[in-house]
Amino acid sequence: VIQGLNNQGFHNIIVVDDGSKDSTFTVATTLPVHALKHFANRGQGAALQTGITYALTQHPQPTAIITFDADGQHRPEDITALATPVLEGKADISLGSRFLSHSNVPLIRRITLKTGAFLIYLFHGLWLTDSHNGLRCLSLHASRELDITSDRMEHASEIIEIMKTKKWTYTEIPIIVHYSTNTLQRGHGGLREAFRVLARMIWRKFIK
């Protein structure tokens, strides 16, 4: 993944090891990246906030911040198109969408994602074709305002809630996601995660 980013001209890379038990952090420290580590597994939302906070600390005036999955699902080739609206001042946040181009999303995951998008619309009034995609580009303004408090997968819904509350301008850009046997196997817990996300959305909307 890092080599692919380097090949596309991206070199200011932050890797957040979210308490993994393998050699991810050790390997990352040997590569030309900023390697950060959570000593306990906290979840993707926590890892994103750690990385964004670090980026703003090290570079108080970044042109933009990209969030990019480290499992090989995202293509570095999609970053330029994703970042263009933000760099041109046309959007505060640019969101990658698997459903604006030829989609190779497996059926079960497609149903889950479309259901999630519908719930996002019901709760927040924003219609997005792909509400839970990890490939995003944030402007400096959005990066500073973002404060993710949901540690796990429900962070994607929280980001959209923040978009609505802060009145960020946004756009969706077509991307291609590569699914491997490993990433599909990890997706088998998707129903449980979906219920967790729904419960969190209800709590934030009606109880908090």
Segments and roles (model prediction):
Residues 1-7:
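Short, well-formed alpha-helical segments that are part of the catalytic scaffolds
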Residues 9, 30-32:
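Short, structured coil segments at secondary-structure junctions
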Residues 11-13, 169:
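Residues at the starts of beta-strands that form the adenosine-phosphate
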Residues 17-25, 72:
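A conserved acidic beta->alpha catalytic loop
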Residues 34-55, 76-153, 179-202:
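Acceptor/aglycone-binding surface of glycosyltransferases and processive sugar-polymer synthases
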Residues 59-73:
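Short beta-strand-to-loop acidic/aromatic patch adjacent to the donor-nucleotide binding site
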Residues 127, 148-151, 160-178:
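Catalytic donor-sugar/metal-binding loop of nucleotide-sugar-dependent glycosyltransferases
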